[in-house]
Structures are given as structure tokens and as C-alpha cells.
Regions:
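Short hydrophobic beta-strand that contains or immediately precedes a catalytic carboxylate
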Residues: 1-4, 168-169
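Positively charged, low-complexity nucleic-acid-binding target-recognition regions
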Residues: 105-106, 110-229
Length: 229
């Protein structure tokens, strides 16, 4: 499950063998347009009048942001429930302390926090577990194992793999997030000898900051060969 910039969330229903059963783009364009309009008015007001008397306007923007986050979190949990998911996997976010940076950046990260919090509450009611994986490189690396991607300058929702293939950035990231969860779950249940053997054959799975969906497929293939031997 990727909390993207281009869409509010991209969900993929994934089995442990890497089979993707379903996927969904969750987006609330009218709510985002409204928030963007408010932020534009705040920016113009600051240019004309400075930062004084801006607090109430930022408070309104934050309320809109919170409502958008809660709608997104509920939608994620409901989608997982409809598809009989056992666990929802997020990227790990630092959930404590202050958020630094520009106010627009603060709103975006704060929204991600609120989405996760709301989704966890809703998921627990459905009996669905919530887990987290390392966020490093989930968007930067192509899910097919071809390496770092480049962004399409004409369409920021798309990225270009080194093979020249165009793909949705957030969808690729959602595959990598799901794969990191399954890689971790598979590896930790194995006896030490089997784990060492698989890690020697698929060394990428030892690097939790750079493993991708393609590594899960290779791991499952090697694991199948190991069990058949």
C-alpha cells in the first residue's frame, strides 16, 4: 500500500508468492482541489499582507487535510476487508515528534500520519493486522528489478524504467512494499541453514532498503527448488 503524491493511495492485493490479485487507486480529486485552492489563497494573502493573521487560514487548511486523510484511511481499510486481506502493509513513517520543513510539506507528511492512524483503527475493527516496512527506495527502484527509475517530465504520475518501459510510479512502489513484507515474513520463519542458503542464492533479500518485487519472485522460485531437493 503506497501513500503517493499523485494519488491519495495505491493498494495492491498480493499473495506470498507475488501473485497480484487486485489493485485500486484511491483518490479524492474534488477534496484535493479544494485544499489546493485554499493553499493558493493563503500564498497570495502572505504575499500581500505578510505572515500575520494567517493562523486561522492555516487551521482551515489543516482541517481539510485531516478530513481527506480520514476518508483515505477508511477507504484503504474497507478495500482490504472487501478483499479478505489478513494484513495491511505501510511504509514506516516516524510517528513521533515535530515535522520540520515548509508548511505544504508538513501538511503532506501529516496527512500520511493521519491516514495510517485512521486505517489502523478501522483495520483493527475488521480483525486485520497492520505492518510496516522500510520506506527507502520503494519509489526510486523499479519493481521489475531493472534499477533506479526516472520521472516522466510530462506526466509526474509515470516513471520510466531503465528498459524504457513506462509505469505508474505509485503502483510500482506498492508492489515493492508488498514484496518487502513477504520477503521478511518468509525469511524469518526459516531454519538458519535454509535461510543462509536462500540468502546466498538471492543476496538482494538481505538488503531491506533495496529489495523489490522481482526479488520476491526469485526468492519464491529458489525456495521451491530448495523444498523439492
Amino acid at each position: 500500500m503506497d501513500l503517493g503524491i499523485n494519488t491519495d493511495a495505491v493498494c495492491s492485493i498480493m499473495r506470498s508468492d507475488g501473485t497480484v490479485l487486485d489493485r485500486k487507486f484511491i483518490n479524492f480529486p474534488s477534496e484535493k482541489d479544494r485544499l489546493s485552492h485554499v493553499l493558493g489563497r493563503i500564498r497570495r494573502f502572505q504575499k500581500e499582507h505578510g505572515s500575520k493573521q494567517i493562523g486561522s487560514r492555516w487551521a482551515y487548511a489543516k482541517r481539510l487535510n485531516t478530513e481527506l486523510a480520514r476518508k483515505t484511511g477508511r477507504s484503504i481499510a474497507e478495500y482490504a476487508h472487501e478483499n479478505h486481506a489478513d494484513v495491511i502493509v505501510f511504509e514506516y513513517l516516524e510517528m513521533k515528534g515535530k515535522i520540520s520543513g515548509k508548511k505544504r510539506q508538513k501538511l503532506h507528511l501529516w496527512k500520511k500520519r493521519e491516514i495510517q492512524t485512521m486505517c489502523e483503527h478501522k483495520a483493527h475493527r475488521y480483525g486485520i493486522r497492520v505492518s510496516h516496512v522500510c520506506a527507502w527506495n520503494t519509489s526510486r527502484l523499479a519493481y521489475d528489478g531493472s534499477g533506479p527509475v526516472s520521472r516522466d517530465p510530462k506526466n509526474h504520475s509515470l516513471c520510466v524504467f531503465q528498459s524504457g518501459k513506462q509505469y505508474n510510479c505509485d503502483l510500482s512502489a506498492s508492489y515493492n512494499i508488498g514484496a518487502r513484507y513477504w520477503i521478511r515474513e518468509i525469511i524469518k520463519t526459516l531454519p538458519e541453514t535454509e535461510r543462509s542458503s536462500l540468502e546466498a542464492k538471492v543476496p538482494a533479500v538481505k538488503r531491506r532498503t533495496s529489495c523489490v518485487y522481482a526479488d520476491l519472485l526469485i526468492l519464491q522460485n529458489e525456495y521451491g527448488c530448495l523444498k523439492a531437493a
